[in-house]
Regions:
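Alpha-helical transmembrane segments in inner-membrane proteins
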Residues: 1-334
Length: 334
């Protein structure tokens, strides 16, 4: 067994501390970036001695900090959701966007906006969760067989077809109810419109979901080693798989409600975490969360430099080649 497959606690701790420092530094730098020129000293004053009458401090507290926090939690949610799905299905090509969770959530959000145009963000998050269940359930039912379980390529093909169908339905709703701008935002992906009213619901719900999945990370690790082995060790495979998939759908649904369809975060980041730390999900999940938060935050900073380009497009620029690389490898199980 290699050191990477059996890392020391000190090595894991060093990764956590190092990535946390990178995340904090990136948060500070990203708060400096925007149309309004703001000094570093102004950020410190806004955090520790907030003055509501100061316009620059208002920009920091009401626009930039919520946007930065949204980028981090969206990245964490999508990355961990992808890690869970890859672990449950043993499919290295799995991603919330590629198996229909994101398009299902977007469809449910478009439908909710059409029926309840002035609804609260809490209702939107719940709708996103239900939509993610719809999209994911259809794809996983098509992609699973009694003979070979979750076949990687069958899941991806089913995901592409279901995502196309749900996206078409979302666009049809947008045309019928004049929601073109809203649906375009969800399709492109971004966190520019996030406010504290969004975060007050999203942060605790994502936090609870992450806590639950961490408490059953050992069971997820065993399940990832094989269904037969998990059953042999006395694990309730159906229950563990169900809980894990529900958590993944909650995380994806909330992320889409905040930022729209941001693909490939859940595909790339878990692979990086496994490369660094091995196959123990008790270590993979915290690393995945930090890496995902950093990735989306950096992508949002780049998007600002490019004149508010879609975050989803920035990440896809990296994600599509990586996805094609994995397909070329044969979409092997993990």
């Amino acid at each position: 067994m290699t050191n990477r497959e059996n890392p020391t606690p000190l090595k894991f701790l060093s990764y956590i501390i190092g990535l946390s420092m990178i995340l904090l530094i990136t948060l500070f730098i990203s708060t400096l970036i925007g149309d309004a020129k703001i000094q570093a000293s102004t950020i410190i004053e806004a955090i520790f001695n907030y003055n509501p009458s100061n316009q620059q401090q208002n920009i920091i507290n009401e626009i930039r900090i919520p946007r930065n926090i949204a980028a981090v939690i969206v990245g964490m949610a999508l990355a961990v959701s992808g890690a869970i799905i890859q672990g449950v299905t043993r499919n290295g090509l799995a991603d919330p966007a590629l198996i229909g969770l994101n398009s299902g959530a977007s469809f449910a959000l478009a439908l909710t906006y059409a029926v309840l145009p002035n609804t609260s963000f809490l209702i939107l998050m719940f709708a996103g969760f239900l939509g993610a269940i719809l999209g994911g359930a259809i794809v996983l039912m098509i992609g699973r067989s009694r003979r070979d379980g979750f076949n990687p390529m069958r899941i991806i093909l089913a995901g592409g077809a279901v995502s196309a169908m749900l996206t078409a339905l979302s666009q049809g709703i947008a045309l019928a109810f004049r929601l073109n701008q809203t649906v375009t935002f969800w399709t492109a992906g971004g966190v520019s419109g996030t406010t504290w009213s969004h975060l007050k619901w999203a942060i605790p719900l994502i936090g609870i979901a992450l806590f639950i999945i961490l408490t059953i990370s050992k069971q997820l690790t065993i399940l990832n080693l094989g269904e037969s082995l998990a059953k042999g060790l006395g694990q309730n495979v159906t229950m563990i798989r169900g809980i894990c998939l529900i958590i993944a759908m909650i995380l994806a649904g909330i992320a889409v409600a905040i930022a729209g369809q941001v693909a490939f975060v859940g595909l790339m980041v878990p692979h990086i975490a496994r490369f660094l730390i091995g196959t123990d999900y008790a270590k993979i999940l915290p690393l995945t969360a930090l890496l995902g938060g950093i990735l989306v935050l950096v992508a949002d900073v780049i998007a600002r430099y490019l004149g508010e380009a879609p975050v989803g497009a920035i990440i896809s620029f990296i994600g599509v080649p990586y996805f094609l690389y994995l397909v070329k490898k044969g979409g092997r199980s993990i």
